[in-house]
């Protein structure tokens, strides 16, 4: 068993369409003090292409409901480099994200993972990958828009209002232990990394039957050092961009 009394950050990961008024009322009895939701984009056509269940209006209303439920630390995820992305569309996404006035914004470039529907669409030439010049332009716009809006660029993909950096993100790169609960969640105890199975049904059944519901990876000194150096390099690149 784990005591949660001293946890300064307990984050719930959710999809916008999950955050109904009733669901948030149920959460009020639990010790979550931060909500992170995967909005990805405010372009409804692209959300449909990505097979997301929510639309732009659902995402905006989810943030509003979280505020009404009393949450003062909200994070949203965005993705850029999406199929058909243009400078104008990305700027519109950034303006809408800023208008929500959330405490934290993470933005990641789209990665085409093998054996996913969108990867298959790319290989079948149904969609096109954005070029490197456009990707760089989108990243530059991301930094310019969010810093101008008062967000601190504290990690390569993460921006926050002053005092609202993600403790999990910074702990991850510093090698500090963390606990992840639920399907697909990751944990680290200082020497091993664990990740729970992704199937909700198998996860629940495994817990009920006392079965192992996670995989384990031992991180030797070399692996931990390489990850530390990777983060140092990322920080150097970020500092260089800020200077430029």
Stretches with model-predicted labels:
Residues 1-235, 239:
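C-terminal scaffold of the Radical SAM
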